[in-house]
Amino acid sequence: MYYMLIGFIIVVIAVISAGYILKRKHYQRINELEETKIKLRERPVIDELSKVKKLKLTGQTEALFESWRSSWDEIETRLFPDLEEVLLEAEMNADRYRFRSATNTENDIEQMLVVIEKQMDQILGGLKELLISEEKNAKESRMTKEKFAELRREVLTRGFKLGETLPYVEAKLNSLAENLNRYDSLTDQADHLEAREIVISVQKEMAVIEAQMERIPSLLHETDTILPEEMNKLRAGYEEMVRKGYYLAQMELDKEISRMKTQIEKMKQNVINLDLDEAEEGIEELHNEIELFYDTLEHEAEARHFVKENHSPTSDKLKRQNTVSDALAEQITEVKQTYHVAEDDLAVYLKTSAKLSEAKENFEQLTALIASGEIAYSAAQDTLKEIDAALLSISSEQDNFAEELRSLRKDELEARDDAERMRRAIITLDRKMERERLPGLPEEYLSLRAHMGESIDALEKRLEEKPLNMKAVSQDWRIAEEDLTHLTEKAEEMMENVRLVEHVIQYANRYRLRNKELADELVQAENHFYNDYQYKKALEIAVTALEKVETGAFKKVEKAYESKVSVDDIE
């Protein structure tokens, strides 16, 4: 019981201590908020309002001043009294240990102080700007009027450089003078804010006018002097080239110069209207156009040099290619008496011949136009280049065709020699098989041998045809070579199998008397070997029978065969 009482007392003391600590924290925060309120109240809003009120305000300035004073009245009559009530409520909540409510109230006070401070900042900032603007206006007004007077003097002394833009510049200056007079009137009425807006506007306008006055003389010089002179030089160069025999009608220069003159008048009017950016852009475009015309004239001069340098060489190339083409036609006639020339191959020649005729016709037309001066040298240059490219293609195609014709005789002789070589190869193969002393030849091989002979006969028969069709010869030639390769491979395989069968049976004989199954299978293998000459099948039967008795025996026999070791020496 005693310990329970002690525990209870400790809890009570802890609660009271915690409450006291929290209460002190809230009082501390409330005091801080109170200090912030006092600092806000001490700000010199009333003093600043009084200073500004003495300025005898009017217009926009007066309206702004009244709005600031109304805002201050709201702070004095409503916001501060409301703030006092909420501060009192916060203290009461803290006294009664209603800490959550106290916290919420303190947060509300902070928000109210922020609102009040923001409004006071706006009032003081506006009042300060107004007081400064009076002094600033006086200083900037003096500088602006001096700058304006300087612009006036410059227009009077250098107005001749502005040309027809002078009335427009003077009209702008007169408008600025009216704005400066209005500034003085507003300043006299103490409407300093609106007066300041006018000063700033006049300064900006004067900067624009000053920049325009710098640009106008050079732009007028472009439209009145430089561009017309450039067009006159262009026309003079054009006419000089025409007198020298250049065909330049495609340029339509008279029409283009007339159009550019209209553009110059338009650009000048833009300058007069003070649309200087548009005028500058248009002037630059005209310079670029004139430059393009000069590029065209220069290209014509270069093209004339090219035509004079390449006309005769191109004529010589045409003559040489005509000679080559005529010789090729004679060669075709001669070859056709001995060889068959395919229609596709003849079509190649006919196509190149037609292209050559077209190139010759184009060259003759070009020569006539150059002589009469009815073609631009640039167009003549393009045509010469096209003719030269066509001749290069024709020459390549006709050279290839001529080479194909020359190769016909060479291919014929090679085919005849190869037919003879293949006959000798068959005889050699037959003799080799005879030396092997085979029991006989299987039907399959005899059939291949007969077919091989027929292939060579077909090739030799084809070579006797008149006219000789070398494409058909090549096809028969290829078939005969393939048949010879196949026959040779079969013969080598057959002789290989015969030797292996003999070695396997000889090795297997060591088991023959002891193994009836092996003996029977060897008899079967020998039957295929000696009777129907199926050497591959005989080898398969003998190997299978031997492997049943001795696994891996065939590898030993095969290795001994390759090493030319006697079967009797195999262990």
Swiss-Prot record:
Keywords recorded for this protein, A-Z: Cell cycle, Cell division, Cell membrane, Coiled coil, Membrane, Septation, Transmembrane, Transmembrane helix
Membrane-crossing residue ranges in chain numbering: 4-22
Cell compartment(s), UniProt: Cell membrane
Domain of life of the source: Bacteria
GO biological process entries: division septum assembly; septin ring assembly
Membrane topology (UniProt): Single-pass membrane protein
Extracellular compartment residues: 1-3
HAMAP family: EzrA
Described function: Negative regulator of FtsZ ring formation; modulates the frequency and position of FtsZ ring formation. Inhibits FtsZ ring formation at polar sites. Interacts either with FtsZ or with one of its binding partners to promote depolymerization.
Protein name: Septation ring formation regulator EzrA
Organism: Listeria innocua serovar 6a (strain ATCC BAA-680 / CLIP 11262)
Gene that encodes the chain: ezrA
